[in-house]
């Protein structure tokens, strides 16, 4: 009788399933969905239900499924520690609602760009780089547009202009008459 009960144990264990919606069950469900997507080439479209990933507009097989394209800022700054000028791409969502910390490529220092979650107490209520620099009397220049380009010459000296409306002499013909 004991042998009969023990021989049925694997069958009984396979039939036992958890009824909770805990993390393990969700993890298993996600793994099974990803496996099914890879095998069948299907993706879940929230608005339209199941659809083939190749029929999604503008998406190819190499495109990441379920990836949300977010708007970004292009941050260009000069490190005050080492003087390195660098550019970083930061999320607009993180800048306005989260925390943004960038690392200087020159000196490897970390610079706080935005702290909307009050992680850093030394900022005294300032939430982003615009407020931090405004408190110091410095300004932030915003450039908008897709192809925006801003060039600033730091040690600019105005060029010498000739008197009146005359054209400057041709430097290639010096001393010739």
Curated annotation (Swiss-Prot):
Interval spanned by the transit peptide: 1-53
Chain intervals for the UniProt region annotation (Disordered): 155-177
GO molecular function: protein folding chaperone; zinc ion binding
Positions of Zn(2+) binding: 79, 82, 104, 107
Gene Ontology cellular-component annotations: cytosol; mitochondrion; nucleoplasm
GO biological-process terms attached to the record: chaperone-mediated protein complex assembly
Predominant place of localization: mitochondrion
InterPro entries linked: Mt_import_TIM15 (IPR024158), Znf_DNL-typ (IPR007853)
Cell compartments where the protein resides: Mitochondrion
Alphabetized UniProt keyword annotations: Chaperone, Metal-binding, Mitochondrion, Transit peptide, Zinc, Zinc-finger
Presence of keyword Chaperone: yes
Zinc finger residue ranges, DNL-type: 68-165
Subunit structure: Oligomerizes in a concentration-dependent fashion. Interacts with HSPA9.
Function: May function as a co-chaperone towards HSPA9/mortalin which, by itself, is prone to self-aggregation.
Identification of the protein by name: DNL-type zinc finger protein
Species annotation: Mus musculus (Mouse)
Lineage, top ranks: Eukaryota, Metazoa, Chordata, Craniata, Vertebrata
Gene that encodes it: Dnlz
């Amino acid at each position: 009788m004991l042998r009969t009960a023990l021989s049925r144990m694997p069958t009984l264990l396979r039939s036992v399933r958890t009824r909770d919606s805990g993390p393990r069950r969700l993890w298993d469900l996600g793994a099974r969905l990803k496996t099914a997507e890879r095998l069948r080439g299907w993706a879940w479209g929230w608005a339209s239900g199941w659809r083939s990933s190749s029929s999604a507009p503008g998406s190819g097989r190499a495109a990441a499924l379920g990836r949300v394209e977010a708007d970004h800022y292009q941050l260009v700054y000069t490190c005050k520690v080492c003087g390195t000028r660098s550019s970083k791409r930061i999320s607009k969502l993180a800048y306005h609602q989260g925390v943004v910390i960038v690392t200087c490529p020159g000196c490897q220092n970390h610079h706080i760009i935005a702290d909307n979650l009050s992680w850093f107490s030394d900022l005294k209520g300032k939430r982003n780089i615009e407020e931090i620099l405004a408190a110091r009397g410095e300004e932030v220049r915003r450039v908008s547009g897709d192809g925006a380009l801003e060039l600033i010459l730091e040690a600019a000296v105005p060029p010498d202009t000739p008197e009146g409306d005359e054209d400057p002499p041709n430097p290639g013909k010096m001393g010739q008459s």
